[in-house]
Amino acid sequence: ARDAYIQRQVALKISRGISSQSRKKLFLEAQSAGRLSNPNILAIYDTGLYKEFCYIIMEYVEGQTLKKWCRPQHLLPIDQCIEIVFKVCSALSYAHQRGVIHRDIKPSNIMLDKQGTPKLTDFGIARISEQKSEKGVWGTPSYMSPEQLKEETGTHQSDIFSLGCVMYELLTGQRAFTGENDFTIIYKITRENPTPVRELRPDLPKIFEDIMRKALAKSLEERYASCMDLAYDLRVALRGIMLPKGDKKVEDIIDLLRQVPFFHNFTREQIESLGLASSIIKVPEGKIIVTEGDIDDTFYILLNGKVKIRKNDTVIAKIRAGECFGEMAYIAGKARVASATAHTNCLLMKISAILMDKAPDAVQLLFFKNFARTLSYRLEKSSGLETGSNSK
C-alpha cells in the first residue's frame, strides 16, 4: 500500500471479524512495537478499528524472513550470520531496556531487507513490564525457553534462549530441538542438549560451542544475563573470523590508531580493548554514512579522508582525520540530527554503543573527555563564524 499523504510505501495488516482475544493480540503488537524506535525493529505507524476491521499500518520492508536462510541449501556466510544475530541482539537489548519482552523470537519473525539489514517483527504476544503477566504457554514450541514451557513468567533471558535457537538454525540449517510432535520437542528443550553445533558445522571456530552453550542454557544462572553479553561474545567471534582476511594485522591497526589525534591520550592496551567494540570500515567517496533522522547506536572516528556533515541539505561541518562524528546520537540516545557523507574515500572506525558500555571504565571516561573536547571545539568554531558574520 502507499501512504498518499506522506508519500511512502507501507505494509498493512488487516483482520476482519476477529475474536476479542485476537483483537487484543493485534493491538498489543501495535502498543509494544509502537513504543520502540530502532533500525532493527519494524516500525509501527498507526493502528485502529474501521467497522468490523482491525488494522495496523507499518513499515514496508522489501525482502524475506530468515526462514529462507535457515535451509541447508541457502546458508549464509558465517560472518553475515553473526552480523544478523548481533543486530537482533542490539534491537532486543533496546526493547528490554524499555520494558518490552518479545516472547516469540523465531526465523519467520525476523525480516532481512535487500541490504541485509534484519528487522524484528510481530510483537503480538510481547509482554510489557508494567503489565500484569498472563499465565499460559505463549510462543512457538521449537523456539521457546524451558521457563516459558513450564508456564513461568518469561523474562528478557527467554528472548535470549529463543534467539540462540535462531542462531543455531542460521548456522547449521537444522533446528536446535526437533521431534515428531510438540511433546517430543518440549521434552528435549527442558531435558536434553542439542547436537553440538560444530558436529554439524565443523568449519565453525570453537568459540561458537561456548556461545551456543550459554545462549541455550536451561538454567537462567548459566544463560547469558543480557543481550549485551551475548553481543560482546559475538563480536569476539566475528573478529576471530575476519582479522585473518583483513588488509592489516592487528598490530598495524593499533599503530594506525595511535597516530590519530583522538587516541593520543590512550595507552596501547586501551586501544586494544576497543577492538571488541569496533570495526574498521572503508567508505567510498559520495556514500552516505549516516542519515538525518535515523535511530542508531553507532558513532564514528575518521581515520583517513574527509567527511561532510549536512543538515537540511546545507553543509554545517567538515570532518577531518582524527575527528569523531555521530557521537550525539550515542550520548543523547536520540535520532540523528544531521547526515554525514564521505567527501573522499574514507577509512573509519565504527564503534557500537552497546559494546562500548562493556569497555573498561577508564576507556569510557577517555572517550567522553574527548567527545567533550570535540564538542567544545565545534562550538568555538561555530561562535567564531557567527561573530565573523555579525561583524561584517
What would you call each of these model-derived segments?
Residues 84-85:
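Activation segment signature within eukaryotic-like protein kinase domains
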